[in-house]
């Protein structure tokens, strides 16, 4: 039993090395331009070793997307846990949350990798991104809808369609940053804050509940 553990650790390390090398090559060359030989050279393994783990390039590509998605989702859901839960300073708190969300989705390495692949390969190989569509935007939208529901139940927001509101919020907070990130630039802190604040103000104009000021005695 114990004798098998070093071999298992070695296999795990080799698999991780292949995934990291494949991610780098796919990001650089795209799916169609990447070759197993190039991935093998980058991972310092043989071509046959890759085929021992993954039967074809498409299988390897799907494994890479799943691996990156797992890491990205772990970071993303830690951000979702910081969603504001009260009406106090809602604009400021939602703005800070939107900044953290964009830093996780758009500005980190995994987020950039996924978006680059989606833009470059999604149209030609839509089936390869089923995992991304189901477990990326879909999960985030559902989680946000549930979070907005809590604020709606407290009378802070007036939302009829929570799923639509969640999609609109996501569209607002990253729309102005998409091209910046697509061309390989990292948005400045000032741009992240301005974009988030404008998005939140627009969102609250649509869904925020305005309570009348108390009457003067």
Model-derived segments and spans:
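An amphipathic alpha-helix signature
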Residues: 19, 62, 91, 95, ...
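N-terminal intrinsically disordered/low-complexity leader segments
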Residues: 1-13, 76, 211-217
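Hydrophobic/aromatic-rich alpha-helical bundle segments in the mid-to-C-terminal region
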Residues: 130, 138, 152-201, 211-217
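Hydrophobic alpha-helical connector segments
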Residues: 63, 77-111, 165-169
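Amphipathic alpha-helical packing segments from all-alpha helical-bundle domains
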Residues: 92, 107, 113, 117-119, ...
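Helix-loop "lid/cap" segments that line or gate small-molecule binding pockets
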Residues: 83-84, 99-106, 115-123, 202, ...
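A short secondary-structure junction motif
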Residues: 68-75, 108, 125, 143, ...
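Helix-turn-helix
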Residues: 17, 21, 25-59, 63-67
């Amino acid at each position: 039993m114990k004798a098998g553990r070093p071999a298992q650790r070695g296999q795990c390390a080799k698999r991780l090395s292949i995934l990291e090398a494949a991610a780098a090559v796919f990001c650089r060359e795209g799916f169609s331009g990447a070759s197993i030989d190039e991935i093998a050279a980058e991972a310092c393994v043989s071509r046959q070793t890759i085929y021992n783990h993954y039967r074809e390039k498409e299988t390897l590509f799907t494994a890479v997307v799943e691996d990156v998605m797992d890491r990205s989702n772990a970071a993303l859901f830690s951000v979702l846990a910081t969603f504001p839960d009260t009406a106090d300073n809602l604009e400021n708190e939602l703005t800070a949350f939107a900044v953290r969300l964009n830093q996780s989705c758009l500005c980190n390495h995994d987020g950039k990798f996924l978006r680059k692949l989606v833009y470059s390969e999604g149209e030609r190989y839509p089936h390869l991104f089923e995992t991304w569509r189901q477990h990326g935007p879909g999960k985030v939208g559902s989680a946000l809808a549930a979070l907005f529901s809590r604020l709606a139940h407290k009378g802070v927001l007036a939302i009829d369609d929570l799923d639509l509101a969640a999609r609109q919020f996501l569209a607002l907070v990253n729309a102005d940053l998409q091209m910046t990130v697509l061309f390989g630039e990292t948005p400045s802190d000032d741009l992240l804050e301005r974009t988030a604040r404008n998005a939140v103000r627009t969102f609250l104009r649509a869904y925020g509940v305005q309570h009348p000021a108390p009457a003067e005695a």
